[in-house]
Amino acid sequence: MKRQRDVRYAVDKDESDDPQAVTDYVVDLYKYYRDAEEKRPMELYMEFQQDINPKMRGILVDWLVEVHLKFKMLQPTIYLTVQIIDRYLSAKQIDRNQLQLLGVAALFIASKYEEIYPPEVADCTYITDHAYDAQDVLDMEMTILRELDWNISSPSAHHWLVRLARVARAPESAAHRAEYFAQRMLQEYAMLEYKPSLLAAAAAYLAMVADEGCDDGWPRACERLTGYTDVELYPCCKAISYHINRAAKDDAKRQLVACKKKFSRHDFSTVSFGKCPVLKRPKLIDLPDLAD
């Protein structure tokens, strides 16, 4: 991966008068995100677990995506929820009858971090069909926070997707498709192999290739932002395509349907109806990206 240069993108120049764009700090912010990625969960933590497996994790995440949609939460919340789960499971063994409790407590924590109006603890017990009571959720919340040493914040693929869409000036449909690819990969334990920045870059690349409003290729602006060339993205792109296309026939059997259903909605441009492109050859294109 190439070292990112200190560059100013054209989109930042255009938005320099918008205080919410924080254009004076955005380069430093994404340098921080890159450094913080090194604290991501262990890739092979299931080898340490004795009573759960990747299939159970996938079903849990699928259910959480459904709950996340039902509660109309912000997109960063589901990413943070799954990160909390994986970070906890990287350090602690858990019984399968406590896995859903871990998931709902992680969602409870993430929502209080990301949402303006997080759900009440009573809502969390309700969505589990009262399999756990309020005290169970609160106890698990404290257990998680102590294990993570109260360090909740962690950069996700969503942070990178937002920036990539702006830098590439991607249409809304491409941004939605990249979000779909990235959120669908939250369910796949094997995808923990890839850093959030790499996963986001690969999802964005595939989305731009699939979208009729985008040129076929990896914009140089995106390469400069992430530090990844199209060649470096190829293995992750291939994995995403596999899980969405070849494994699609097994999703119903594995009960992984919530993400596809969520992104079939019109407010997400119905992007889950389409297939994920399969890249045969990396192709680099050039787009204007640097401010004068």
Regions found by a protein language model. Name each.
Residues M1-V104, F108-D292:
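Acidic, serine/threonine-rich low-complexity regulatory regions at protein termini
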